[in-house]
């Protein structure tokens, strides 16, 4: 009897939900269309595997603004550049906040930069933007990235001389982590597994936990059965936080002795907070969580883009040869390149942009929440809805990009390229656009540029590498091995 009653209640709620979400006419609001969702799971049966590709298929049926349900979370997916501008730029006061769930609250406690909202986020965003701006003017910072890119190139040498294959993705992760650690704390780790910094294992474990964490966010009831995963995430985050806390203490002690000795981003953070009119607003918890955010997000995004770029250059050896020739001309035959030569390498720059376009690591962006009803063309996005930018869908739009699924750097060199600014947003758009985007481009340019000057890369078996990838905390390549020849 109880089961029958529950079934009837679920059926009634399901019918009410269907009618509630149908588009309305007349004086009533019109909601974005979308596929029928099921009780409890929503549209997860359609989205669970490769959600960026699944949404792409649904988009062709329901349009560039559609509603889907991640379990019971109403989500509006936007795949149109004009609507993106309307929603995230023109109405940024309604769409700047993050959609927060269990995992994001554990990571940020609403006191970091990725997963905080309101005035708190605005204050830290301002400090971060000012610090990054001053960082770019600091000569020693550029030298740190350049030297790290040389060390990355040296890390490949053993594989070239021994004839052993190597998974470049793991070396790229070490490179991007070292760049962030150098810029943030003036620390670095060895590329040798035996000499690696203990924080590296903790960061890897956090990444693994986050993949399962998404499931716990959608179905909180599973926390009862997956307590170990949550505990594992917290324990590894504690290691990252402790490392950041120790570094903050170390930097403060140094600045007390010599306030003028600015070596890195953390020094700039501490100084900017002192100069801020809201200095009493910032506490140590916020500072160590912001620093930890940079370690977590800055490492994965740039390393994934480097892995994609090398993959496409291996699958297109003529492009790889052309890039190498251009780099050698720019350096006058030298085997190292710096940022001063960046303006001399238009084709290589185009390859970087094309990798960012064709495989954006933030394929579906970090979700926002509509803090009020939001207008999106003829539709209304209701208050409380989750909103996602379909970055991948924008990049695959055949009305904007000719042959969008083909890696073609020449599209960026064409004089008649006229796509909307919001058709290419690998670093997001609006008030939450990535403040470290220029830095990321520089680290990709130097890292890939210096290895291409020293080695020829081929796939392990001479066949093209799988270009599909997989969807995790970022859109990543499958692990692949390469052969390399020293030049």
UniProtKB/Swiss-Prot annotation:
Its cofactor is heme. Its EC number is 1.14.-.-. Keywords: Heme, Iron, Membrane, Metal-binding, Monooxygenase, Oxidoreductase, Transmembrane, Transmembrane helix. It holds the Pfam family p450. Its main location: membrane. Heme binds at residue 434. GO terms for biological process: organic acid metabolic process; xenobiotic metabolic process. It is found in: Membrane. GO terms for molecular function: heme binding; iron ion binding; oxidoreductase activity, acting on paired donors, with incorporation or reduction of molecular oxygen, reduced flavin or flavoprotein as one donor, and incorporation of one atom of oxygen. PROSITE patterns: CYTOCHROME_P450 (PS00086). The keyword Metal-binding applies. It comes from the Eukaryota. It is a single-pass membrane protein. The chain crosses the membrane at residues 1-21. One of its GO terms (cellular component) is cytoplasm. Belongs to the cytochrome P450 family. PANTHER family: CYTOCHROME P450 307A1-RELATED, HEME-BINDING MONOOXYGENASE FAMILY. This is Probable cytochrome P450 516A1. It comes from Dictyostelium discoideum.
């Amino acid at each position: 009897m109880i089961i029958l009653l529950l079934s009837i209640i679920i059926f009634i709620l399901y019918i009410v939900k269907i009618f509630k979400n149908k588009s309305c006419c007349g004086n009533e609001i019109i909601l974005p269309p979308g596929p029928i969702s099921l009780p409890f799971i929503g549209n997860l049966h359609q989205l669970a595997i490769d959600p960026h590709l699944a949404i792409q298929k649904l988009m062709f049926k329901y349009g560039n603004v559609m509603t889907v349900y991640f379990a019971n979370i109403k989500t509006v997916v936007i795949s149109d550049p004009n609507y993106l501008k309307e929603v995230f730029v023109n109405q940024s006061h309604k769409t700047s906040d993050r959609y927060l769930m269990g995992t994001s609250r554990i990571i940020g406690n609403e006191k970091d930069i990725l997963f905080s909202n309101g005035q708190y986020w605005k204050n830290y965003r301002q400090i971060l933007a000012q610090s990054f701006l001053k960082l770019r003017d600091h000569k020693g910072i550029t030298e740190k990235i350049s030297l790290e890119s040389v060390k990355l190139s040296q890390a490949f040498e053993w594989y070239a001389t021994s004839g052993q294959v190597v998974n470049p993705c793991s070396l790229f992760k070490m490179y991007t982590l070292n760049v962030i650690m150098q810029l943030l704390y003036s620390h670095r780790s060895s590329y040798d597994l035996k000499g690696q910094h203990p924080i590296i294992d903790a960061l890897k474990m956090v990444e693994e936990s986050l993949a399962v964490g998404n499931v716990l966010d959608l179905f909180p009831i599973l926390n009862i059965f997956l307590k170990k995963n949550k505990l594992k995430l917290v324990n590894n985050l504690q290691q990252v936080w402790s490392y950041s806390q120790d570094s903050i203490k170390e930097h403060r002690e140094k600045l007390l002795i010599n306030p003028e000795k600015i070596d890195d981003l953390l020094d700039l953070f501490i100084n900017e907070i002192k100069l801020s009119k809201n200095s009493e607003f910032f506490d140590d918890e916020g500072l160590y969580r912001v620093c930890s955010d940079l370690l977590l997000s800055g490492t994965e995004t740039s390393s994934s883009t480097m892995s994609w770029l090398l993959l496409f250059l291996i699958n297109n050896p003529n492009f790889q040869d052309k890039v190498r020739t251009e780099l050698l001309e720019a350096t006058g035959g030298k085997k190292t390149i710096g940022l001063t030569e960046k303006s001399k390498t238009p084709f290589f720059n185009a390859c970087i942009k094309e990798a960012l376009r064709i495989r954006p690591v933030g394929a579906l962006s970090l979700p926002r929440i509509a803090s009020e009803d939001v207008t999106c063309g003829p539709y209304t996005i209701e208050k409380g809805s989750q909103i996602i930018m379909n970055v991948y869908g924008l990049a695959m739009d055949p009305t904007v990009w000719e042959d969008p699924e083909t890696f073609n750097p020449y599209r960026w060199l064409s004089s008649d390229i006229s796509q909307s600014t919001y058709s290419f947003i690998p670093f997001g758009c609006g008030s939450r656009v990535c403040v470290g985007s220029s830095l990321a481009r520089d680290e990709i340019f130097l890292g890939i540029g210096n290895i291409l000057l020293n080695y020829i890369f081929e796939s392990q078996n001479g066949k093209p590498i799988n270009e599909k990838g997989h969807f995790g905390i970022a859109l990543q390549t499958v692990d692949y091995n390469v052969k390399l020849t020293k030049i």
